[in-house]
Amino acid sequence: MEQEIIHDIFFSYRHGNSSGDARALHERLKNLYEISFDVENIYSGELPDILYKRIDECTDFIIFVAKDTFDRTLNSLDDKDDWVRIELAYALKCNKNVIPIKVRIDDFPRNLPPDIAQICHKSGPKYDDYYFDAFVEKLRNYFLKSKAKPTYDFEEYIPVEKRKVKNAAEYRETILQSFSPIDLLR
């Protein structure tokens, strides 16, 4: 029988606008933490049940906030399929360590609905393609409460200039090449 994995971190993001950024961060952290990342490890079952269970078990909830992340939320306040809002509202209700990662934006929308408005009072590092290593270290050292698992992958100790992939833009390009166009629209 397969052992059930308990996730440390839950990734929430709007497919299409920050998929590549979420994937790049997942690639960097996956050897250090158990991450609930839908395109990697959500299989069959009732989606709401799986998502709620994963949020319940995680310590950290990372939400990638890009320019249009909350457009769907603001346009229809009762959209039952707005998973970004549903996930965020549940994580806030459960008092998870919610870490917003702003992706190429400076501010949150001003008129968020009450069940998720508290996100405006949460802090997180701003996503940075160019200084990706510094961004990841800041996230790990100052925002994540989950403890990293021991690893024998020494790439994180290799100087950036000697790595095969040096920054998030290169990660994203490499990763997006492995996606089909259908994956990007989900």
What is the predicted function of each stretch?
Residues A22-A24, L74-L77, L112-P114:
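Short amphipathic alpha-helical segments
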Residues K67-K96, D106-F108:
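Conserved TIR/SEFIR loop-to-helix hotspot centered on a Trp-containing motif
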Residues S123-Y130:
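Short acidic-hydrophobic, aromatic-tinged amphipathic segments that line or gate anion-handling sites
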